[in-house]
């Protein structure tokens, strides 16, 4: 039995396996869902049985699998829990300033603590920084230097405004770093936007500490008024009250001005002495005065505006008058220079400036130049301020109040110190043994330089040149064949109606040594021979008169008294706007404008004229001073300026010297083009797409032609400026400079392709045959050959002149023909316009007639249809006509029956009803009533219907 049981058991297991594998009973060919579930359970059961068997046999594998699963679950849980922290947390901030620094460093952004300490100090400077900002790091040393100098008066606080957990980062939203805010007690913040330099920061802080400048004396008043900055003066009496009414408002207005303009363009001063106040027309305490150099100075209108700090600053800023402006580019993208250059020609002065210095001699000279340049009416107040700037002693002032412009000077007020020059009239054939020598003097008016300040009676170059021009126009008046006396004549200048010239002339022979008319005190008596006199006169001719700058250096004291410069801004169409820049900070701009990079003194002056697309520089070898500035401005202001346009170019050292094609720059242009060779110059730029395709052509050309007689060169005109006469309007352009005829340069035809054969033909056609090397075996030409060649040349010249004359006549005839054709074209154009207007009128009338014709056609069709209907109606008998005939016949019968015997009542009753019904009027469009027969038939039909 055990075997059966065993076999049976075995058979049972096999049957289960068979069912699991087959998915159903033996012999079944398809799988059912119940069989699939049983199969899955069988697999799981067998897997668990195998795992338990393996665990019993090798328990260490089970423990390892369990440990590995736990580790995977732990790692997955840890990763998912840290999924939000994808940014590394910021490191805690550290101190930005050292512990020994005078700056209080709140590196954790404690803005509330900064507000707390600000309440205990009168002046506080807050420095907001970001630790990673390079500009903040660079400004750190400057802030420390300024704080060390002002630590006993000002509290400097640095705040880290970048740490994300600090209050500064949460409450302040700055777009740049560093940021400097200044608080003066409860007033602020005043933001500083100037250069991050210690001296400028200290100057700004000191300006905020003392916004008002005390004026105790007349000298201090002149210092205040002669400054280039606009000045506002307030008069307050402190005798009756320690704080007069309006003083605090005036004090706040000075701080308000500094808040609006960190440069402190408008200065504020206080006068407490009533005598000083009267000099500027201030009488009542609390009045405010705005000084202006050239326009009428103003007093604050209390009756029009409220006396508030903002109104005072607004009034001063709207009415201020500036001599020149300080420019401080911040180094980034800015329209500062562009906006100023749009206003007109600009004079840029780069000077080393120390804001903390008490005196600025060079700045005083520039101020003096600006005052004279704009002093158009010779104002006495401006003259007094100029004397103060020159440190010239002057009498005590009576008043600095503005006065009305003086009337034009009379002839008696002409200056008593004319300037003279000796000239010689051109001699003619009849006067070969005599010469007319004249002393030409320019009489100056009071509107120019005062005689008291004139040290040398010498005119400027321009005045003497104008006098010579007017003199030579009237030289026939001064010719005398033989005259022993001195004759003088006065004539007005054509340039100014308020000045005139005096010419005193005398005829002398060649042997005369000197003039004898010393009693006139006009002519000098030089003891020289006429030959030397003639040489000296030739030296003083207009073409040989030294340049104005040379003249000023020859007579330096004359520059102080020149009348040509005073009020020049009102006598020229090229008025300059003057701008100053600190060369210690912005020397890079000066280098880009033409200043040398290795200048021993960083002083530079340049004039930029955007409209004329040119700029001029003052010679760096000349010192920047009043004389040179006046000469520089005068030379620019004349109509035909002697200044040379500054040209910028590439560095010639970067190009190799030994090359087939010579690279030309601005500095080497004249050297290359003026060689004793034929020079072919190509104009190109880097952005010209067609220019590089010509390189192989010019390389082949340079290889074909000999180097000793021909030069192939090129110039990049985008990097190198050239004089106007050598500029071109298209690229590429080829210019040819012949060897011995450099003034006859030729441009390659623009409509001719630039190819090697065309270039060779062009060069051979325009080259100089004389420049080619001659064969030593050929003998020189004979005299007859030279004479015949000269005759041929003269004939050729006469032929060319005749051809030119014919061309001129043809041009004149063509011009007349052109004028006639233009007149005819104009009349034809007028006729065309007139015909066009007539055509438009006719077209409009035609459209009106067409619309009228269409209306008539529609009306015609309508009437035609009506006529057809009438004709149709007249041809067809209408039912109304028949009904009328019956009615007439009936009435006739009734009339006939009235005279006969009476009929029975029913018949008589029926007739009136019938007649009544018959008497009803029917319109032509109505339906005729039915006849009697039809009525009877209708009644019978109804009766039959009712019966049925």
Swiss-Prot record:
Lineage: Eukaryota, Metazoa, Chordata, Craniata, Vertebrata
Stretches with biased composition (Gly residues): 1-13
InterPro entries referenced in this protein's UniProt entry, alphabetically: Thioredoxin-like_sf, Thioredoxin_dom-contain_11, Thioredoxin_domain
Protein name, UniProt field: Thioredoxin domain-containing protein 11
Keyword DNA repair: no
Transmembrane portions of the chain: 61-81
Subcellular location: Endoplasmic reticulum membrane
Chief localisation class: endoplasmic reticulum
Residue stretches in coiled coil: 793-874
Region (Disordered): 1-35, 895-948
Subunit structure: Interacts with the cytoplasmic part of DUOX1 and DUOX2. Interacts with TPO and CYBA.
GO cellular component, one term: endoplasmic reticulum membrane
Phosphoserine PTM sites in chain numbering: 798
Keyword annotations: Coiled coil, Disulfide bond, Endoplasmic reticulum, Membrane, Phosphoprotein, Redox-active center, Repeat, Transmembrane, Transmembrane helix
Similarity field: Belongs to the protein disulfide isomerase family.
PANTHER family: THIOREDOXIN DOMAIN-CONTAINING PROTEIN 11 (PTHR46497:SF1)
Compositionally biased residues, Polar residues: 915-924
Pfam families, per database record: Thioredoxin
Top-rank taxon, per record: Eukaryota
């Amino acid at each position: 039995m055990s075997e059966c049981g065993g076999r049976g058991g075995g058979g049972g297991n096999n049957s289960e396996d068979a069912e699991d594998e087959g998915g159903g009973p033996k012999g079944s060919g398809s799988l059912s869902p119940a069989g699939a579930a049983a199969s899955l359970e069988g697999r799981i059961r067998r897997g668990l049985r195998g795992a338990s068997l393996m665990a019993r046999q090798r328990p260490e594998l089970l423990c390892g699998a369990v440990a590995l699963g736990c580790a995977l679950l732990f790692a997955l849980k840890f990763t998912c829990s840290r999924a939000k922290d994808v940014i590394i947390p910021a490191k805690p901030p550290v101190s930005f300033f050292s512990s020994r620094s005078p700056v209080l460093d709140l590196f954790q952004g404690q803005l509330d603590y900064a507000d707390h300490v600000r309440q205990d100090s009168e002046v506080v400077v807050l420095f907001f920084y970001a630790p990673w900002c390079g500009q903040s790091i660079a400004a750190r040393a400057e802030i420390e230097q300024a704080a060390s100098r002002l630590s006993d008066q000002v509290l400097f606080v640095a705040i880290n405004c970048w740490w994300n957990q600090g209050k500064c980062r949460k409450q302040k939203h700055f777009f740049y770093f560093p940021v400097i805010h200044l608080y003066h007690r409860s007033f602020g913040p005043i933001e500083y936007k100037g250069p991050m330099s210690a001296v400028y920061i200290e100057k700004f802080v000191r300006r905020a500490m003392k916004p008002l400048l005390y004026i105790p004396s007349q000298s201090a008043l002149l210092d205040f008024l002669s400054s280039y900055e606009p000045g506002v003066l307030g008069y307050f009496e402190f005798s009756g009250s320690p704080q007069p009414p309006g003083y605090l408002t005036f004090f706040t207005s000075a701080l308000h001005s500094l808040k609006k303009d960190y440069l402190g363009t408008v200065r504020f001063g206080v006068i407490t002495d009533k005598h000083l106040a009267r000099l500027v027309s201030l009488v009542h305490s609390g009045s405010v005065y705005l000084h202006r150099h050239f326009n009428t100075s103003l007093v604050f209108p209390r009756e029009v505006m409220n006396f508030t700090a903002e109104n005072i600053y607004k009034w001063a800023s709207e009415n201020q008058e500036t001599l020149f402006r300080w420019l401080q580019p911040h180094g980034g993208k800015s329209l500062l220079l562009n906006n100023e250059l749009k206003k007109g020609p600009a004079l840029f002065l780069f000077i080393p400036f120390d804001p903390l210095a008490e005196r600025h001699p060079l700045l005083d000279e520039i101020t003096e130049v600006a005052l004279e340049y704009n002093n158009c009416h010779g104002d006495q107040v401006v003259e007094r301020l100029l004397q103060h700037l020159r440190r010239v002693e002057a009498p005590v002032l009576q008043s600095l109040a503005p006065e009305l412009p003086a009337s034009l000077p009379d002839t008696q007020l002409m200056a008593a110190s004319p300037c003279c020059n000796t000239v010689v009239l051109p001699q003619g054939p009849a006067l070969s043994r005599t010469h007319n020598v004249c002393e030409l003097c320019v009489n100056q008016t009071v509107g120019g330089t005062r005689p008291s300040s004139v040290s040398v009676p010498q005119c400027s170059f321009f005045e003497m040149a104008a006098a010579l021009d007017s003199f030579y126009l009237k030289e026939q008046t001064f010719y005398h064949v033989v005259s022993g006396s001195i004759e003088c004549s006065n004539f007005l200048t054509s340039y100014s109606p308020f000045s005139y010239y005096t010419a005193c002339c005398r005829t002398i022979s060649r042997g005369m040594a000197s003039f004898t008319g010393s009693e006139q005190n006009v002519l000098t008596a030089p003891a020289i021979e006429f030959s030397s006199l003639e040489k000296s006169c030739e030296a003083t001719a207009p073409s040989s008169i030294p340049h104005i700058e040379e003249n000023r250096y020859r007579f330096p004291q004359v520059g102080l008294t020149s009348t040509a410069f005073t009020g020049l801004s009102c006598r020229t169409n090229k008025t300059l706007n003057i701008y100053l820049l600190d060369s210690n900070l912005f020397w890079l701009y000066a280098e880009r404008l033409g200043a040398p990079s290795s200048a021993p003194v960083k002083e530079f002056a340049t004039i930029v004229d955007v409209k004329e697309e040119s700029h001029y520089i003052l010679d760096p070898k000349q010192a920047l001073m009043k004389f040179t500035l006046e000469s520089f401005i005068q030379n620019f202001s004349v109509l035909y300026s002697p200044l040379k346009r500054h040209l910028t170019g590439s560095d010639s050292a970067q190009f190799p010297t030994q090359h087939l094609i010579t690279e030309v720059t601005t500095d080497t242009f004249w050297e290359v083009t003026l060689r004793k060779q034929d020079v072919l110059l190509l104009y190109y730029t880097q952005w010209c797409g067609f220019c590089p395709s010509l390189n192989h052509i010019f390389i082949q050309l340079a290889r074909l032609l000999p180097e000793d007689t021909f030069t192939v060169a090129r110039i990049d005109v985008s990097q190198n400026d050239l004089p106007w006469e050598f500029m071109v309007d298209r690229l590429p352009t080829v210019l040819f400079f012949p060897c011995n005829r450099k003034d006859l340069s030729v441009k390659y035809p623009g409509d001719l392709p630039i190819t090697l054969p065309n270039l060779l033909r062009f060069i051979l056609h325009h080259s100089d045959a004389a420049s080619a090397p001659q064969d030593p075996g050929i003998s020189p030409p004979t005299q007859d050959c030279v004479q015949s060649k000269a005759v041929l040349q003269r004939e050729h010249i006469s032929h060319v002149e005749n051809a030119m004359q014919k061309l001129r006549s043809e041009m004149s005839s063509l011009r007349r023909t052109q004028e006639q054709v233009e007149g005819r074209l104009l009349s034809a154009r007028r006729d065309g316009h007139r015909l066009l207007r007539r055509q438009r009128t006719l077209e409009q009338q035609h459209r009106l007639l067409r619309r009228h014709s269409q209306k008539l056609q529609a009306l015609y069709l309508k009437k035609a249809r009506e006529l057809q209907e009438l004709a149709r109606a007249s041809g067809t008998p209408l039912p109304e006509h028949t009904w009328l005939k019956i009615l007439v016949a009936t009435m006739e019968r009734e009339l006939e029956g009235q005279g006969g015997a009476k009929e029975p009542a029913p018949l008589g009753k029926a007739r009136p009803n019938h007649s009544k019904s018959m008497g009803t009027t029917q319109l032509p469009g109505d339906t005729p009533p039915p006849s009697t027969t039809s009525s009877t038939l209708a009644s019978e039909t109804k009766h039959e219907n009712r019966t049925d």
